[in-house]
Amino acid sequence: MAFANFRRILRLPNFEKKRLREYEHVRRDLDPNQVWEIIGELGDGAFGKVYKAKNKETGILAAAKVIETKNEEELEDYMVEIEILATCNHHFIVKLLGSYYWEGKLWIMIEFCPGGAVDAIMLELDRGLKEPEIRTICRQMLEGLTYLHSMKMIHRDLKAGNVLLTLDGDIKLADFGVSAKNVKTLQRRDSFIGTPYWMAPEVVMCETMKDAPYDYKADIWSLGITLIEMAQIEPPHHELNPMRVLLKIAKSEPPTLSSPSKWSPEFHNFLKTALDKNPETRPSAAQLLEHPFVKKVSGNKPLRDLVAEAKAEVLDEIEENGEVEEEEASDTPSSNKSVSQSALGEKDKHTGKEHVGNGIKAEPQNTDSQADIHSQKRNHEGKNYPEHNRHDAVNGKPDIIILNPVSSNHEPKRNSAAESYRNEEHGSAVSSNQRPKSSQSDRQSVELVPNGSFDSPTRYFTGWSKRDSDSGSNSASESMDISMNLSADLSINKETGSLSLRESRLHKKTLKRTRRFVVDGVEVSITTSKIIGDDEKKDEEMRFLRRQELRELRLLQKEEHRNQAQLTSKHSFQMEQMLRRFEQEMNSKRKFYDSELEALERHQKQQIERMEQEHALRRRDEARRIRTEQERDHVKFLEQLKLRKKELKAQVEKLPRQQRRDAMKVQMDDFAQKKHIEEQQFLNKQKEDLTLALRVIVLENRKEIYNKEREFLNKKQQLLRDREAVIWDLEERHLQERHQLVKQQLKDQYFLQRHELLRKHEKEQEQMQRYNQRMMEQLKLRQQQERARLPKNQKAEAKTRMTMFKKSLHISPSGSAAEQREKIKQFSLQEEKRQKAERLQQQQKHEHQLLEMQAECDCNVRDLLQMQNEKCHLLVEHETQKLKTLDEHHIQMIREWRENLRPRKKALEDELEHKKEEQEMFFRMNEEVAGHPFPSNKPAKFYSFSSPEAS
């Protein structure tokens, strides 16, 4: 103790405080760089980067999650993930290969999955998954979830991005960063955590109301949303802001597939069953394993084929459309449009066939060795951004799959491979023995050229490349059918002032992508074509910004979870401290009254012993005094007897001598006999008097002791009453203090919720401001491009119109040359007026667009503020209701406590009265025993009594 004070004075470091907490699965004594070699970067997560690592000894690959921590407290946030990974041992859950904490960085080494995440595969293939693939993934996910839930764990962040694929066609559930490890299977949680689009309604409600916690069935809802995501590339409500989607989930009906006809009834029924807003009726993972949608799934061939397609070699071929020559456009007859497009389509067909043939060595003569299969078209109804829908009309359709056997041994497998890649949307496929038809019409729909341009497109080849899905690369969307009116190529929309479809395609490129891979020994080649433009960059930018928003939300959730955990820990400590103080106060009061009772009993014992000693002395003195008096009386009595004897002798002496002797003898005998009788009677009387006197003394002593015992008993009972009264007061005060503490903790809880909600609202407003600013910038950029293109287009159109006007004058001449020049001059003036009107109309349209966009942005802000105010108001209502319920519960507890206090008081008084009766009965029995002629040797209950003189 002295050394501690000395150390405090000298401000020496406290080594006990710096003692680091040891974790079971985290090594602090080893540099991970000595064991693992970083060979690449896989991605950037919300809390750190993920690297591809290789074990220097075993060569095992791992995904290294490297997280920088500022202090030891942050390290605690990741322990649940490490413990879950270390505890779980299942075929469909990633394994923990090791974890290290070195130089302020936490390294989590996780099993590497070469197939990558499912969402990355969908972006790479630019399509959603087919139903057989979804069935297989769903089956494996359900088995993994069944194991997780049996281990009392909730994933809480199920989505396609957290489902990894191996080369063997198996899935691995990953990312347990926000998972919960429970003590009981049915344990509920109230943390608002996860990714909004995949959140269950009961999890969403926990943002403002903690009264309805959720359990493991929240994962079932996330599973259903993940299946929709895999079918449609994006989850439901993906077009909404991550914060605003929460309100949609809570208030709207469960989502469904956007194209019901594409999917089987079993799939629809499975989603309807899993996406039940009532968690009580929502089935568990084990129950869903018996659903017809996944019950008959056997094997993982669809996933093996999917991974093979995603990991295929890719040849990207970019065709850039040239500018339109104004002179050619004006001089070319309209009848040449179809000719030019047809010729170009035939040329492109041969060009494409040449490159595909070089890539896969196709033999056109062998009709049995190739098949042309149109893969399913991507559904853009739920596309993320409205700009995509504008360009759906210019995307091409053809997807070509060419199957070539690697050797003659694989000839029987051609048909099965073709069947596995049949068109899921239409339910049909071209058989392998059919000759592919000319793709001229399809190519025409893809590679349209502007009217009047006879120049062939410039081609760019990016070459074969190996694409890893886990690298997060995004590919372009598949081609779509188009229908357009070529006669409007040179026109300008009078209503909107926008450029024609032809002009919008002048600066676009056509991407033709060929994927080549092997399935069951059969080499498969898939070719897709699409029109790409600036919107591709916009889509990628919007996707990146959306991921950034989700990352910001994830960071907010993590910090909120940490603050919530700290507050919960603080509240638990406060409650434990208060209960400990209550116990100490109670024990202190009890100890005080127990010591008072002990002191009173000691004083009682001493007092009784002193009284008994005094009584013994008094009885002995009184007995001695009585005996002394009795001895004096006895001497006097003997003296009297002697006098009587002398008198008797004197009387006998008076008799004659002859009678004197006989008379003396008779008289003496008679006197001796009387003397003996009288003396015996006298002694007996003295003895009785002594016994009576001593008995009176004993009774007086006992009465005095009884009074003293009653006095002490009253004092004891008063102490007991005081002790119980103090205990009751303490109990009531403790109930009050406990209520005040719980009430204050509830206020602190809601204060933290309001604080976190305001932080979320600030982040929402910041994101909304960025979104509105981005929309305004895009609109201004588009308007600037339109303004820049308008003069050029007007010039080209004016030249064309002037040429046509001159030709009309030349065909039907009327008037002199001067009149024709005047007409041409008037036509030029009209063209200038028309162009000026077009410019004015465009300016007005742009101003109107800006006003509309500004109004839309303001409306978005108002809607956001209204939604935020509703959340705040709802939170305040919940707090008020919770406080009211808490007060009512406290009043009820006080009422019940007081009702229970009455029988406790009555029981105490009955017990005290019973003790009084026992004491009275005890002394009454002693008095009765004392009334017998023989002395009682029965020991006293309240005091000991011994008198040698009384015996």
From Swiss-Prot:
Annotated active site: D157
InterPro entries xref list: Kinase-like_dom_sf, PKK, Prot_kinase_dom, Protein_kinase_ATP_BS, Ser/Thr_kinase_AS, STE20_Ser/Thr_Kinases, STK10_STKc
GO cellular-component term (any): plasma membrane
Ranges of compositional bias, category Polar residues: 331-343, 364-373, 429-443
Chain coiled-coil ranges: 583-723, 898-928
Amino-acid biosynthesis in keyword set: no
Cellular compartment(s): Cell membrane
Positions of post-translational Phosphoserine modification: S483, S487, S491
Residues the entry annotates as binding ATP: L42, G43, D44, G45, A46, F47, G48, K49, V50, K65
Residue ranges with Basic and acidic residues bias: 345-356, 374-394, 410-427, 785-800
Record field: compositional bias (Acidic residues): 319-330
Protein's name according to its UniProt entry: Serine/threonine-protein kinase 10
Source organism (scientific name): Xenopus tropicalis (Western clawed frog)
Lineage: Eukaryota, Metazoa, Chordata, Craniata, Vertebrata
